[in-house]
Amino acid sequence: GYKGDLLRNYIGHKYKGLKIEYIENPVYDKTNNIYSLSLAKKELQKDDTLLIESDLIFDDTLFPMIVYNPYPNLALVAKYETWMDGTMVRLDEENNIVNFIPKKAFKYGDVDYYYKTVNIYKFSKEFSTTNYVPFLEAYTKALGNNEYYEQVLRVITLLDKCELKALPLQGEKWYEIDDV
């Protein structure tokens, strides 16, 4: 994607013994993140996945928070504040995500119920294989590649048994730097 060469040169192919693989989206300027993620669908089905958007800065404690949480399918979220923009979610009393609210469906009258997606997710191999990737393929086939991957999660929350939970932050710092 955008400035991908700079990123690869800066990070390299290994970090502290961890192998880093890159998936190139050559049409990043004509597609959205749903297409970039669809390019990685084989990798999503090989193992558990941490999905982290590249335009984030965040407190180091967020990684262990999500990695060591016992729930296999998790989204980090933060209680809505006025500076937040983008996809929101609504939760039930057990922190199950019951709806993803895209920017165009945002209602100021509902802000007391909104949590902003931090855009750090954990998906189990099973969730990716049986839920996310099949819906990702159907969604892109029906609606194209200029959409957001959260829209697929929105569809999944409509299932009778959605296995995606939220982990609300408790004051940990994060910010989307594309808004700076």
Language-model features and meaning:
Residues 6-9, 61, 152, 176:
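Phosphate- and divalent-cation-binding pockets in alpha/beta enzyme and binding domains
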Residues 15-17, 46, 68, 92, ...:
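Short, well-ordered coil/turn elements that cap or connect secondary structure elements
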Residues 1, 54, 78:
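Cofactor-binding loop segments of dinucleotide-utilizing enzymes, especially the Rossmann-like FAD-
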Residues 114-180:
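Conserved alpha/beta core of the MobA/IspD/sugar-nucleotide pyrophosphorylase nucleotidyltransferase superfamily
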